[in-house]
């Protein structure tokens, strides 16, 4: 096999090899992806109901928009975290193009930068979650702080999975 397909298949990152480094994190990644998939299905159902209620029943439901936005944040942040574990998200192609010790240094830098971004996400979102928890979400009986919670969880998971990759080094 030659051409772009061969290069893509050869260069595709994988989470294989990480189980011996952090076996429990594989279960966390599977659970995270399962929750993201369930949230995506729920998001689709809420959007369908939003359209049916508005255009078929002529009685729009106020709760659908804030719930859809919350589900979207869950899908995006949890999906991004799993993508970090598989190194298919926040991937730095420059590291793969570099030679020898520069490749390892750039991959290490990329993983550290990703972990730092995850930590900042988690801390910043935690402060927003706490600061806005007592406020109510317009249109839905939910605390406004709940809308920032996916960034707390997703940011923490991004950091954990980036550190897992850092510990694994070039393996996987």
Feature names for model-found ranges:
Residues 1-172:
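Alpha-helical transmembrane segments and membrane-interface helix-loop junctions
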